[in-house]
Amino acid sequence: MKKEVVVIGGGIVGLSCAYSMHKLGHKVCVIEKNDGANGTSFGNAGLISAFKKAPLSCPGVVLDTLKLMLKNQAPLKFHFGLNLKLYQWILKFVKSANAKSTHRTMALFERYGWLSIDMYHQMLKDGMDFWYKEDGLLMIYTLEESFEKKLKTCDNSGAYKILSAKETKEYMPVVNDNICGSVLLTENAHVDPGEVMHSLQEYLQNVGVEFLYNEEVIDFEFKNNLIEGVITHKEKIQAETIILATGANPTLIKKTKNDFLMMGAKGYSITFKMPEELKPKTSSLFADIFMAMTPRRDTVRITSKLELNTNNALIDKEQIANMKKNLAAFTQPFEMKDAIEWCGFRPLTPNDIPYLGYDKRYKNLIHATGLGWLGITFGPAIGKIIANLSQDGANEKNADIMLFSAFFRD
């Protein structure tokens, strides 16, 4: 079976690549090992949080994380063991936690955040129907020290709105008196990731993109400097261009003789109903404990915790209990009705810079992975970048790849 473009992976990055490649007139086939109904992209917080928000690795994060570990509130949990890559990842994470690297990354976040928002607008114009709100991201601070630190970065550009603890309750009625205040980052937005995924799937199917669900790619056939065949557990597929967007699963990446500095970070979310009068008015992030709380049509979702160096795909009830406990410290008592607990693995690089671009060996292979917790934020932008790259034909001819790919970042 021969295809023009094969996208391996049906998450937000894979679907966004399929969307933009189709827009260029290509015939696209998406291969997804599951049924496409509940992957990692579905469990995302839904934040489009590219603006005025630092990456995970930033100045002070190491000491802050150690302090939070003592209180069981740290955003990262490390399962230490005999895994050299974990220690390489941690070393790179620590090295990236400096002002110069953070400044550059935040500038890139802004550039590609606007591109993602443009792409979401295009999707809505194309008739897709999903929850999309451009009403800012409320950064809630529970430590006076970090609140004061954030206030020093705010300017009069209109991108920031500084709120007292009392004013914060107008946006986040559920908070209690244990908060210090908040900053509304006005340029940010949020979506319901499940609705985005379903709408994008439906649109792509309607315009002729082929989907091979429940079909797992298990290997490749190589010939000289090309991938001659994509081998699934059902068939062999040939393709002119192959886009590898398999997220946190390193198996296929390793089969292409690559081993990216990327960890599968296990993240958690709880989706529930709560009293309408207490629901957040916009997407919110408890900055000091790295917990997002996002309103949707009928429900609210909290997301938190990233575990590194674990392959356990089961929900850790202790982690769920810690999330609830940490949230309860800063909110009024309320009942989480019809709660749905979830966990999934995100492809996390130590500096939040993804692996994008043509493979160094195989000329018809393009990589698109490593967005970690920022898949919904940058997925549509990555799809556009990859489509443009396919026209350029080489990494060095595409400025976005040179700027935003880990292949070209120290």
From Swiss-Prot:
EC number: 1.4.5.1
Catalytic reactions on record: a D-alpha-amino acid + a quinone + H2O = a 2-oxocarboxylate + a quinol + NH4(+)
Pfam family, one: DAO
Gene3D superfamilies membership: D-Amino Acid Oxidase, subunit A, domain 2, FAD/NAD(P)-binding domain
Function of the protein: Catalyzes the oxidative deamination of D-amino acids. Has broad substrate specificity; is mostly active on D-proline, and to a lesser extent, on several other D-amino acids such as D-alanine, D-phenylalanine and D-serine. Mediates electron transport from D-proline to coenzyme Q1 in vitro, and is involved in the electron transport chain from D-proline to the c-type cytochrome in vivo.
Similarity comment: Belongs to the DadA oxidoreductase family.
Protein name listed in UniProt: D-amino acid dehydrogenase
Record organism: Helicobacter pylori (strain ATCC 700392 / 26695)
Lineage, opening ranks: Bacteria, Pseudomonadati, Campylobacterota, Epsilonproteobacteria, Campylobacterales
